[in-house]
A protein has these predicted regions:
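… and, occasionally, acidic/histidine-rich disordered N-termini of signaling adaptors
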Residues: 1-170, 225-239
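C-terminal catalytic subdomain
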Residues: 161-173, 178-239
């Protein structure tokens, strides 16, 4: 995973919850700065524990190689990186034919922005982004398609979405372990609406404070019930 201290310096404010269900897991994040631009990606790989961590290591390796081999700006766009990752992850996992026993992959998203710019570029693979701006919280969904799975090979390509932001805008991306977290009493999932209401309620909090509040909220929701999944929640305020 990227050096968190270096990653934090690329943002006006930054917060992270990263909690594998086991000692290691399938949630992973990626960030890089290149020529006054920042990229940040979050991925939710198949499985938990060692199997999930194995897929995440392959994914991060292929993503970094794709970025390093890019010849120009267009090849570093989030959609292009996701399209390449879909292909190379499937190849690395041996899932180009229908006879294999494995069918692993990931959901994910990549954000790109130029320092000081008033827009970001987002592409999502079955993972949305939440934008908080001017007292309003909006959800922008990615393509309904995952990365690497056999079944995703024939689906439409990923698309870049340009999103206007300002210096006070806040961006949130998260794995489904956050919204799927089960309540101790009856197993009810925490849910997307409850998360959005929580973020709206705490829009004045710093992102580090917000993430601690969310962690406490999820812990209180779950109580002594074991985690269902790996949990990752990323909050960002671009410079």
């Amino acid at each position: 995973l990227p050096d968190l201290e270096k990653t934090t310096k690329n943002f006006a404010d930054f917060g992270l919850i990263w909690e594998p269900r086991d000692i290691v897991g399938g949630d992973c994040y990626w960030s890089i700065k290149f020529e006054k631009k920042i990229w940040f990606g979050l991925f939710d790989c198949t499985g938990h524990g060692v199997p999930g961590a194995f897929v995440s290591l392959i994914l991060l390796s292929r993503l970094m190689r794709s970025f390093q081999e890019a010849q120009n700006d267009s090849e570093r766009l989030p959609s292009k990186l996701l399209n390449n990752l879909d292909t190379t992850l499937r190849e690395s996992l041996g899932q180009n034919n229908s006879s294999g026993l494995r069918d692993d992959g990931a959901d994910g998203s990549i954000i790109q922005w130029e320092l000081g710019s008033s827009k970001i570029v987002f592409a999502g693979a079955n993972m949305p982004i939440l934008i908080q701006k001017g007292g309003k919280l909006s959800e922008i969904k990615g393509v309904r398609r995952s990365l690497g799975y056999r079944r995703s090979k024939s689906l439409s390509e990923f698309k870049d979405i340009a999103i206007k932001i300002n210096k006070k805008s806040r961006l949130f991306i998260f794995t489904d372990g956050v919204t799927d977290e089960g309540r101790e009493l009856d197993g009810l999932a925490f849910g997307r609406k409850r998360l959005i209401d929580f973020l709206s309620k705490h829009e004045k909090s710093s992102l580090s404070s917000l993430n601690q509040l969310l962690k406490d909220e999820l812990d209180d929701w779950r109580k002594k019930k074991p985690k269902r999944d790996d949990i990752t929640f990323v909050s960002m305020q671009p410079l």
